[in-house]
């Protein structure tokens, strides 16, 4: 992602990790990681930079949960009402499947290693 997007993510994560807020971060997801044309599914074009989210995850000691590419079929299938993410044989389907697996794994790890998140009431 672009540097301004990384700066915004860094600010948000730092806010949530602050002792006064203390909201656990499961990890980062990079949307629009690269462009893959349908006719060349093995090709990746990094339109917004490469590995910025990976570097941010390493810097902040949080896992990179997934990278979601830009593919034209997302829009086309969305317009038809058939989410391409459900097609496990597609590039985007594989990306969402990996993301889902990583979210489950990090949630299980968080639940095993950290105390339950406390609910804070802000009003009566």
What is the role of each PLM region?
Residues 1-76:
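Conserved catalytic-core segment of NTP-binding enzymes
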């Amino acid at each position: 992602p672009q540097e301004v997007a990384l700066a915004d993510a860094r600010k948000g994560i730092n806010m949530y990790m602050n002792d006064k807020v203390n909201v656990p971060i499961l990890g980062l997801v990079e949307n629009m990681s690269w462009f893959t044309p349908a006719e060349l599914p093995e090709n990746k074009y990094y339109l917004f930079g490469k590995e910025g989210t990976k570097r941010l995850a390493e810097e902040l000691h949080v896992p990179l949960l997934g990278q979601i590419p830009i593919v034209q079929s997302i829009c086309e299938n969305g317009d038809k009402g058939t989410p391409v993410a459900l097609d496990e044989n597609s590039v985007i389907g594989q990306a969402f499947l990996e993301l889902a697996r990583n979210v489950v794994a990090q949630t299980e790890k968080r639940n095993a290693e950290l105390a339950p998140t406390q609910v804070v009431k802000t009003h009566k």
